[in-house]
Amino acid sequence: MTQISERLLVQAHLDAKQSNPLTPEQEADYRAAIAAELKRQNAVLVAHYYCDPVIQALAEETGGCVSDSLEMARFGKNHSAETVVVAGVRFMGETAKILTPEKRVLMPTLEATCSLDLGCPVEAFSAFCDQHPERTVVVYANTSAAVKARADWVVTSSCALEIVESLMDNGETIIWGPDQHLGRYIQKQTGADMLLWDGACIVHEEFKSRQLADMKALYPDAAILVHPESPEAVIDLADAVGSTSQLIKAAQTLPNKTFIVATDRGIFYKMQQLCPDKEFVEAPTAGNGAACRSCAHCPWMAMNTLERVLDCLRQGSNEIFVEPALIPKAIKPLNRMLDFTQAARLKVSGNA
């Protein structure tokens, strides 16, 4: 997934899959129907911050969860619902199934994937790991169940830095996959000995440092918020770097009234909800037209529509299955992450 021509083919495929816009009346009907189905089926809707605002609002209204991938995993595992509907991309649905194999996990579409997942096929990644058996394998959550099963640790962007620091303190050297930009950022912050896989997010790698500097000149009082999946030159311009949840917290706590945000624009829903008196501006990508492969919104996240949420509930379609042999292997590094972050939470709160 590194050639522009390949990106354009992917984008054309995804554009063809998008539904027509709904009228306000149609949207209200879908939301009511989905809420009724969730209640009838003892189901819960979990949505990522990058989903369209209407999906995030629906998850909140129906007692579900809107969060980053770490909290999505934790919420789905701990919730009493028999069915979890995951509005996000496929690896998120797989993670939910791995953590709670006894539950039914549905997704609005199984075609919503991730360029990081696609760019890290298990055969090639396993061969890379086999060449360095002395290294601890740490993989980003944006990977397939098979890649997770090959790993020692799974991390999200909200906990990756702390986990790598802990491993480094233990004298461990690391294989990191698949996001090269996040890996390089962690390497720079910690000084850890890391071999990096060559993957990238099609949204975040589109942010451009020169255009970002030009935009900062237009908004001199703005703070720049950057997700660490962005290129290093973009990260270097940031006032705050972090995961989606960390960027939302930065928007709440920094005194600035204007923010230039270098991550998927789906996050603006929660930022504007929590900070109604502040202004949020999209960081510039490659530009308009064919050269812009994402334009600050993941095309796969955009495939999570109201129509597809209702269809998957009514038809029981798009159920996530994970190969049974992979589950015990993949759940170990996932539980390590959850246990680590829970212990860190307790330590911060003074309970450990």
Swiss-Prot record:
Cofactor note: Binds 1 [4Fe-4S] cluster per subunit.
Residues annotated as binding iminosuccinate: H48, S69, Y140, A141, N142, S157, H227, P228, E229, T244
Gene3D superfamilies (UniProt xref): NadA-like (3.40.50.10800)
Known EC number: 2.5.1.72
Listed pathway(s): Cofactor biosynthesis; NAD(+) biosynthesis; quinolinate from iminoaspartate: step 1/1
Keywords assigned by UniProt, alphabetized: 4Fe-4S, Cytoplasm, Iron, Iron-sulfur, Metal-binding, Pyridine nucleotide biosynthesis, Transferase
Main EC class the enzyme belongs to: transferase
Protein's GO biological process: 'de novo' NAD biosynthetic process from L-aspartate
InterPro entries recorded: NadA, NadA_sf, Quinolinate_synth_A_type1
Recorded catalytic activity of this chain's protein: iminosuccinate + dihydroxyacetone phosphate = quinolinate + phosphate + 2 H2O + H(+)
Cofactor(s) listed in the protein's UniProt record: [4Fe-4S] cluster
Coiled coil: none
Localization, UniProt: Cytoplasm
Gene Ontology cellular component terms for the protein in this record: cytosol
Residue numbers binding [4Fe-4S] cluster: C114, C201, C298
Pfam families: NadA
Any one GO molecular function term: 4 iron, 4 sulfur cluster binding
Role: Catalyzes the condensation of iminoaspartate with dihydroxyacetone phosphate to form quinolinate.
UniProt record similarity statement: Belongs to the quinolinate synthase family. Type 1 subfamily.
Listed name of the protein: Quinolinate synthase
Source species of the chain: Pseudomonas entomophila (strain L48)
Annotated gene: nadA
